[in-house]
């Protein structure tokens, strides 16, 4: 056979290249991997190899060719808890696929799949089992009669296993799956394909041949399609003869680096450590690709998925004993491992490592905040931390459950683990519903309804007024033929002068009108190049086909144009003042302000903000004329045009150029000259997530109004402080100095009171077995003063001191404070201030915690203060007497 002449394929790269080469020779067009950020609004991430082809399968987009093949990077997080636990679950994986769009069907798909796995990958027939849908006799016959597989190797399964569908309605069809048998010696009787130790499914052939209507009836599709998927990691496990996917050359080099940092050996590690190693190895691949595709860590959407993955990596690093920052070192290995097939990883190397570093540092700080929140829960006197609270600590603060349980147990508090698991299951179900299905149905939503419309022609760059024809009217997302006065509508036109919200710029407002109708348009959105005009009918009736005119508000368009041009100038100024690597992470161009999000690990100083404002205003005064041209994307990038990181652009792009200042790819509206902006003012700068800063600014009339309001405020302050505007700074400084002096005097008086009070009781210490016990009530001191008194008493009494103070700071508030301070020798015999104070405070319906030598607590029941202090004294006397007996 020809397989004897073919080089043995083993490595992950060889498997991928062989697959693409094989189908390329079968006249399939090789399609590069799409981004992990899909064009499809119904899914958050690219979760399957076929997702980039979904519009083709639906007939909404022209097919790239009749046949296609790809190696598509994918991410799924719906089974994240199984990652590292099973041999084959991953968040990041590569799906090899071959696709037919109305060309070949079952026979060729099966024949070529068999040729690939037996001739190219050289798998033995003895190791292959095939499954088919139990009603799909056609596929079963092809496998047995034409391929020659023995019927005992063909397993017929039901609809749940071998019938693919995108939803309750839409395209669907049977599928046939290829399984690898690791133990063929066990024979072919009573085969159970669910036996994960023996079988692994590695190639799925979907025969998309039916359309299912709402009644469940199946009818043949006009064009039958093929959609296949082969997991690269699974095929690597098979060909490299490994126990699991993680030990293949696709992931194991990352795991080896983790072992080096943790100073452990993978093969001699226990199961718990191996799971942590696998999780970090898997998540590393997901994280570097997400960041490279433009995702930044945040608390929303894709950003939250990225943040969660990074936090899991840090957590499992801690479980392995890694206490220092380590993720950038791991990520570098992942980048080096995959950059040949994904050059974007190399190009974005610095960005990836910086994002990971910042997020790791931030999470370590978050862990500290989580510990503080946990301390508050413990201090509240609760004897049980609810599952909801434990899950909040885990989900919001990234605080591991086992850490919550461990700390709670130190304070004799239980954690509702079952309740935590219930909350976790609720989240899992939400995740599955959001991320595991690819919707190919066409009914029921605005997203699908607009597919029937042609692209809206936008002619609003040169004119604000034009004629148009109504092509669609929506009421409550339902397509209707007409609408009447008073109704809120969504209108689709054949052409428009209204700018549709995109690129951060808000949609225009204005009117759509004719002689007998008027619609006030308050927003315009753009979806799939169809402009959606939202408005209210003020008079008349709208009908499909009606001729109307569009009239955009010129004043608001001018404001948006000024703010959009100002945004471009701001980005150039940021690059000049801070760093050339500054890039846009998001923006808002509204009528009254602009907002710009950008990558920066450090806050922007006041001096830098001043320089940025000065630079932008100098460009405004220089009166630069803008040049706007359409050109190919490659030409624009060669000329130095700035593109937003992670944004998708057509082959032809619009370039907005302020010569010598700024050049960007942009579809927004702009002024003709920079002097039209008038002035520019930054009103705020803040961090919004790890490594991302936000600037809000004003231009034009909004900036002038801001200056006017500030001037009025200065005049009001001048009147209030009885000082001229130029004397305000000196006047406020003097007032601050006076306030500081007054506070010092007050604190001095508090310290004197505290000194007097603790001096009056320090001689009342009781000696028990050589230890000095001082338990007393001191009222009228705040927390700081009570703490100071306890520490001074401990210092006075020495290493064998045991000081417990309780008091009422203010009788009107009816709250108690407790402080426990122990000398070194008291700690050595086993006393723990944190545990002791918790028991004392509970008597008064309170709680607290702290370190072995010092702790503080709060409580509510002031009537039981004496009982609490008596308990403390009796407990110490018994404990020390017991220590004496020993």
Curated annotation (Swiss-Prot):
A GO BP annotation: alanyl-tRNA aminoacylation
Q: Name where it mostly resides.
A: cytoplasm
- Enzyme class (EC, first level): ligase
- Record keywords, A-Z: Aminoacyl-tRNA synthetase, ATP-binding, Cytoplasm, Ligase, Metal-binding, Nucleotide-binding, Protein biosynthesis, RNA-binding, tRNA-binding, Zinc
InterPro entries from the UniProt entry? aa-tRNA-synth_II/BPL/LPL, Ala-tRNA-lgiase_IIc, Ala-tRNA-ligase_IIc_anticod-bd, Ala-tRNA-synth_IIc_core, Ala-tRNA-synth_IIc_N, Ala-tRNA_ligase, Ala_tRNA_ligase_euk/bac, DHHA1_dom
- Any keyword Ligase? yes
- Per the record, what is one GO cellular component? cytosol
Q: Which GO terms describe its molecular function?
A: alanine-tRNA ligase activity; aminoacyl-tRNA deacylase activity; ATP binding; tRNA binding; zinc ion binding
PROSITE patterns from the entry?
A: AA_TRNA_LIGASE_II_ALA
What is its cofactor?
Zn(2+)
The UniProt catalytic activity note for this protein reads:
tRNA(Ala) + L-alanine + ATP = L-alanyl-tRNA(Ala) + AMP + diphosphate
Q: Name the Pfam families for this protein.
A: DHHA1, tRNA-synt_2c, tRNA_SAD
Q: Record's domain comment? A: Consists of three domains; the N-terminal catalytic domain, the editing domain and the C-terminal C-Ala domain. The editing domain removes incorrectly charged amino acids, while the C-Ala domain, along with tRNA(Ala), serves as a bridge to cooperatively bring together the editing and aminoacylation centers thus stimulating deacylation of misacylated tRNAs.
Concerning its family, UniProt says: Belongs to the class-II aminoacyl-tRNA synthetase family.
Cross-referenced PANTHER family, in alphabetical order?
A: ALANINE--TRNA LIGASE, CYTOPLASMIC, ALANYL-TRNA SYNTHETASE
What's the protein here called? Alanine--tRNA ligase
The organism named in the record is: Prochlorococcus marinus (strain AS9601)
- Which lineage do the record's taxonomy fields give for this organism? Bacteria, Bacillati, Cyanobacteriota, Cyanophyceae, Synechococcales
GN (gene name): alaS
């Amino acid at each position: 056979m020809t397989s004897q002449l073919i080089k043995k394929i083993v490595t992950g790269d060889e498997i991928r290249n062989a697959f693409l080469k094989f189908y390329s020779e079968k006249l399939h067009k090789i399609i590069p991997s799409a981004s992990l950020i899909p064009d499809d609004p119904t899914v958050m991430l690219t979760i399957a190899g076929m997702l980039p082809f979904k519009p083709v399968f639906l007939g909404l987009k022209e097919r790239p060719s009749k046949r296609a093949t790809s190696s598509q990077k994918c991410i799924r997080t719906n089974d994240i808890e199984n990652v590292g636990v099973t041999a084959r679950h991953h968040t990041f994986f590569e799906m090899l696929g071959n696709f037919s769009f109305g060309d070949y069907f079952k026979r060729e798909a099966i024949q070529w799949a068999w040729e690939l796995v037996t001739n190219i990958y050289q798998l033995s027939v003895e190791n292959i089992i095939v499954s088919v849908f139990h009603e799909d006799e056609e596929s079963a016959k092809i496998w047995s009669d034409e391929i020659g597989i023995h019927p005992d190797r063909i397993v017929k399964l039901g609809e749940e296993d071998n019938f693919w569908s995108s939803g309750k309605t839409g395209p669907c069809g049977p599928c046939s799956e290829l399984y690898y048998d690791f133990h063929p010696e066990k024979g072919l009787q009573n085969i159970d394909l669910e036996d994960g130790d023996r079988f692994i499914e590695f190639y799925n052939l979907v025969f998309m041949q039916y359309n299912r209507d709402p009644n469940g009836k199946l009818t043949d599709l006009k064009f039958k399609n093929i959609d296949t998927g082969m997991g690269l990691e699974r095929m690597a496990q098979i060909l490299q003869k490994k126990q699991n996917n993680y030990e293949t050359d696709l992931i194991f080099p990352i795991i080896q680096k983790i072992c080096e940092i943790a100073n452990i050996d993978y093969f001699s590690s226990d199961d718990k450590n191996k799971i942590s190693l696998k999780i970090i190895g898997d998540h590393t691949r997901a994280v570097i690709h997400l960041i490279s595709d433009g995702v930044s860590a945040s608390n929303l959407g894709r950003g939250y998925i990225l943040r969660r993955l990074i936090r899991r990596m840090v957590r499992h690093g801690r479980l392995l004993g890694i206490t220092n920052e380590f993720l950038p070192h791991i990520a570098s290995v992942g980048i080096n491992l995959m950059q040949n097939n994904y050059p974007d990883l190399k190009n974005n190397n610095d960005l990836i490592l910086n994002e990971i570093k910042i997020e790791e540092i931030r999470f370590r700080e978050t862990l500290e905040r989580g510990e503080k929140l946990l301390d508050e829960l413990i201090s509240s006197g609760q004897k049980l931390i609810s599952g909801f609270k434990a899950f909040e600590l885990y989900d919001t603060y990234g605080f591991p459950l086992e850490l919550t349980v461990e700390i709670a147990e130190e304070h004799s508090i239980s954690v509702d683990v079952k309740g935590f698991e219930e909350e976790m299951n609720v989240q899992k179900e939400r995740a599955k519903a959001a991320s595991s299905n690819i919707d190919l149905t066409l009914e029921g939503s605005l997203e699908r309804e607009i597919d029937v419309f042609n692209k809206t022609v936008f002619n609003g760059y040169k004119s604000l007024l034009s004629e148009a024809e109504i092509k669609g009217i929506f009421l409550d997302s339902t397509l209707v033929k007409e609408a009447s006065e008073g109704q809120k509508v969504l209108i689709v036109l054949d052409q428009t002068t209204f700018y549709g919200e995109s690129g951060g710029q808000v949609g225009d407002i204005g009117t759509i009108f004719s002689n007998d109708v008027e619609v006030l348009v308050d927003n315009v959105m753009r979806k799939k190049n169809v402009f959606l005009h939202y408005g209210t009918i003020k008079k008349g009736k709208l009908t499909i086909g009606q001729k109307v005119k569009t009239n955009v508000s010129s004043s608001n368009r001018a404001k948006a144009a000024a703010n959009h041009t100002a945004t471009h100038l701001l980005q150039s100024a940021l690059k000049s003042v801070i760093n050339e690597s500054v890039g846009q992470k998001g923006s808002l161009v509204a009528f009254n302000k602009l907002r710009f999000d950008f990558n920066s690990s450090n806050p922007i100083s006041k001096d830098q903000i001043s320089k940025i404002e000065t630079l932008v205003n100098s460009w405004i005064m220089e009166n630069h004329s803008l040049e706007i041209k359409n050109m190919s994307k490659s030409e624009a990038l060669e000329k130095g045009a700035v593109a937003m990181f992670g944004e998708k652009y057509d082959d032809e792009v619009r370039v907005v150029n302020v010569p010598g200042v700024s050049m960007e790819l942009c579809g927004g509206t702009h002024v003709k000259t920079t002097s039209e902006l008038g002035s520019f003012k930054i009103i705020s700068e803040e961090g919004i997530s790890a490594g991302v800063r936000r600037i809000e600014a004003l231009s034009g009339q909004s900036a002038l109004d801001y200056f006017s309001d500030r001037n009025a405020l200065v005049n009001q302050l001048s009147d209030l402080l009885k000082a001229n505007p130029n004397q305000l700074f000196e006047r406020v400084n003097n007032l601050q100095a006076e306030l500081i002096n007054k506070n010092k005097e007050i604190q001095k008086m508090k310290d004197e009171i505290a000194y007097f009070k603790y001096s009056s009781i320090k001689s009342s210490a009781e000696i028990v077995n050589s230890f000095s016990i001082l338990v007393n009530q001191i009222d009228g001191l705040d927390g700081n003063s009570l703490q100071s008194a306890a520490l001074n008493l401990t210092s006075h009494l020495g290493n064998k001191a045991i000081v417990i103070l309780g008091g009422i700071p203010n009788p009107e508030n009816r709250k108690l404070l407790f402080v426990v301070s122990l000398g070194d020798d008291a700690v050595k015999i086993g006393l723990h201030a944190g545990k002791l104070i918790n028991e004392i405070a509970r008597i008064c319906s309170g709680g607290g915690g702290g370190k072995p030598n010092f702790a503080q607590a709060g409580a509510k029941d002031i009537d039981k203060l004496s009982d609490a202090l008596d308990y403390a004294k009796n407990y110490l006397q018994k404990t020390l007497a017991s220590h004496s007996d020993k």
